[in-house]
């Protein structure tokens, strides 16, 4: 247990993860792969994007929750380089495509 993590940070993490889980539930209800993601600006706590997979609905193999959050977050912040001050909450380990986008 990290003693430096305060209760408010843990509560925020739990809140954002619950939002991601809600997105995953929405995906499941639409027969999509049940993955959800939420992108949060670390400094302000502002939610920049919240998505679920829509690969089937959009007939787009890149319409993963993580990719959609990265795209919307970059647009909201004025470019992908500004994503460094964000946290991405995802309901499972990202695939190689999404991991590459997140690490870039």
Model-predicted segments: where are they?
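Zn2+-dependent cytidine deaminase-like catalytic core
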Residues: 43, 49-104
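Short beta-strand scaffold segments in enzyme catalytic cores
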Residues: 35-41, 45
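Conserved hydrophobic/aromatic pocket- or pore-lining residues that grip, position, or stack substrates
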Residues: 20, 36, 69
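Short, contiguous pre-domain boundary segments
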Residues: 1-8
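Short, basic/aromatic recognition patches
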Residues: 8-30
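Short, basic and Ser/Thr-rich N-terminal targeting/leader segments
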Residues: 31-35, 84
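Low-complexity, intrinsically disordered short peptide segments enriched in small/polar/basic residues
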Residues: 2, 30-32, 67
């Amino acid at each position: 247990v990290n003693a430096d993590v305060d209760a408010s940070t843990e509560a925020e993490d739990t809140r954002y993860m619950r939002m991601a889980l809600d997105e995953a539930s929405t995906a499941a209800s639409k027969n999509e792969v049940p993955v959800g993601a939420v992108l949060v600006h670390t400094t302000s706590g502002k939610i920049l994007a919240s998505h679920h997979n829509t690969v089937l609905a959009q007939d787009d193999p890149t319409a993963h929750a993580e990719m959609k959050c990265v795209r919307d977050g970059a647009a909201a912040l004025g470019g992908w380089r500004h994503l460094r001050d964000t946290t991405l909450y995802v309901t499972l380990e990202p695939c190689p495509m999404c991991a590459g986008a997140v690490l870039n």
